[in-house]
Amino acid sequence: MRLLGAAAVAALGRGRAPASLGWQRKQVNWKACRWSSSGVIPNEKIRNIGISAHIDSGKTTLTERVLYYTGRIAKMHEVKGKDGVGAVMDSMELERQRGITIQSAATYTMWKDVNINIIDTPGHVDFTIEVERALRVLDGAVLVLCAVGGVQCQTMTVNRQMKRYNVPFLTFINKLDRMGSNPARALQQMRSKLNHNAAFMQIPIGLEGDFKGIIDLIEERAIYFDGDFGQIVQYGEIPAELRAAAADHRQELIECVANSDEQLGEMFLEEKIPSISDLKLAIRRATLKRSFTPVFLGSALKNKGVQPLLDAVLEYLPNPSEVQNYAILNKEDDSKEKTKILMNSNRDNSHPFVGLAFKLEVGRFGQLTYVRSYQGELKKGDTIYNTRTGKKVRLQRLARMHADMMEDVEKAYAGDICALFGIDCASGDTFTDKANSGLSMESIHVPDPVISIAMKPSNKNDLEKFSKGIGRFTREDPTFKVHFDTENKETIISGMGELHLEIYAQRLEREYGCPCITGKPKVAFRETITAPVPFDFTHKRQSGGAGQYGKVIGVLEPLDPEDYTKLEFSDETFGSNIPKQFVPAVEKGFLDACEKGPLSGHKLSGLRFVLQDGAHHMVDSNEISFIRAGEGALKQALANATLCILEPIMAVEVVAPNEFQGQVIAGINRRHGVITGQDGVEDYFTLYADVPLNDMFGYSTELRSCTEGKGEYTMEYGRYQPCLPSTQEDVINKYLEATGQLPVKKGKAKN
């Protein structure tokens, strides 16, 4: 056997403890990181990666191992803080207590002289915006799957997000040491559920309690991980009983890559045997095109398979120069046609600086803004401009972050991720070093909130702390919305799920000393129409002197079901009956009037306002006239329309032991769920269903009760659809009671 890590063995031989060895290696690499960050590292020596997965797949544990093996930390800690410390990447006290990652912690490290920027992202669906932000600014990703759970609910969400931002990724099937681990099933699910051309790069030597190591199918050798912390990597011959399986899997790998890479495909057709370098280059090309997904294996908790994964990040994921990033040039004439400009990835100051603020955070260092640099050079002391607000900012400090610790740097170049201090901006803002450049990076996709609760401080004297905390959270998280309900005199907070809002309530108490009282959760219902309805509305007001006059004619149309959350405005006018400068006023009136629907007081959506004709007055017509005309036209159309209420439908995934299958299905049916699929492994089954969010409250308690605490579930927002007649009637009656109105007339609502 050829042995790597001779220095480690020598150190152990001299009686040095593994922890001290880790400390020594940490010192060396820490200096390497500092030295590298101050010099201009070439693009080839940089990787910007994210680690994403379903909740509890082992992302944070994997990141902790990566930081240990690369010398960034001296000791490894367990995620749930059983040792009183908690994982390094879980820097918030709440994260260490719960054992889930809430915010994406950013860090950087070195592996084989390559600088790796890592974002560790939350797996819980309520924190999806963190994953969106991470993937928007990264060049590659590692998707972590659980060998037992396989492809789960949040895995599909992350997969969609990676597709949206065209992020190449590797897959790491984790937890091969667990009972019921089945990497072959996970691979099959990747192919069937995610529709990926995926193949094993490694196969395991044993599974569950017998998991000893892995076989590298490219190099055709066995890899073992020795030492107390798996820090000694040994290479050896493939065990005799696994040689046939290894040969079969290697052939399958070559076929999968040949199907997606032209050069290897030609070699395959000519029956040439590809060399190791041929195969690696083909895998790299196919991975960068997202036409092939390499699959790696291991167990982060048992310290197996992490170092080969790090090698693969260097080998197969892109450097900043291999990814095309575009900025949008916003023209002054406000035309809808946008010009895309390709960013230059050269790590010098030959091009103007362009960067995207993708995360805001208020920590012990003050207001932090995480920025991904896409072009040019950024120096401490530079003046940069926010293209959205036009404000200029002078950089006092520039830093690189390691979870909640930081390191000052003098410069940052294209491809770097850094933190700025004291910058007034919002998530998604673009910064340049030239005023009025008109450039902006494509904005981060922000999903609409689906749940709301009323919240107020327990103590009236804490109002200042409450508003300060709420203000900070809304700046940090675009999916956390706040508004004041003037009718009920309540502060309403909205977010992506119960856990999302619960976490913020707890953070107010912990970080601001402001315990809060929360009301019952309220679902974000919407109202829409079921068929097109015409309108012909004239707004006229005469009160002496110049009056107001605006006439609009057109039709209000329902949008397709997939666009139920949108509002559209279409100008189909000809001539000058409505002067073009007044058309935006009609649109504003329409959008303002959609804030509150007539049936239940919820927002109107899924509508298209088609403006076809109208009239104006030479003296009395002005902007406010057509705003009022737009509002009146919508109200007139709604009075003649058949309305229905839309509700959010959640994609629910339940995992429980087989003996409780009947109770679980009955529970989902009781909650008006539609079962969309089933899966099973060993003694557990997985149920997939679409369930109205309004019917999911209290489900965690019911599931624990009917499965003796052995069942668990996850859910994510799926779509909006018309709610059941009974639900619609209930929602309308509650609104009428709350507003003191008379009962609604029969036939007003669609039953």
UniProtKB/Swiss-Prot annotation:
Q: Where is the tr-type G domain?
A: 44-321
Which InterPro entries does the UniProt record give? EFG_II, EFG_III, EFG_III/V, EFG_IV, EFG_V, EFG_V-like, EFTu-like_2, G_TR_CS
Identify one Gene Ontology CC term for this UniProt entry: mitochondrion
Reaction(s) catalysed by this chain, per the record, are: GTP + H2O = GDP + phosphate + H(+)
Q: What pathway annotation does it carry? A: Protein biosynthesis; polypeptide chain elongation
**Which species?**
Pongo abelii
Q: Where does GTP bind?
A: 53-60, 120-124, 174-177
- Stated name of the protein: Elongation factor G, mitochondrial
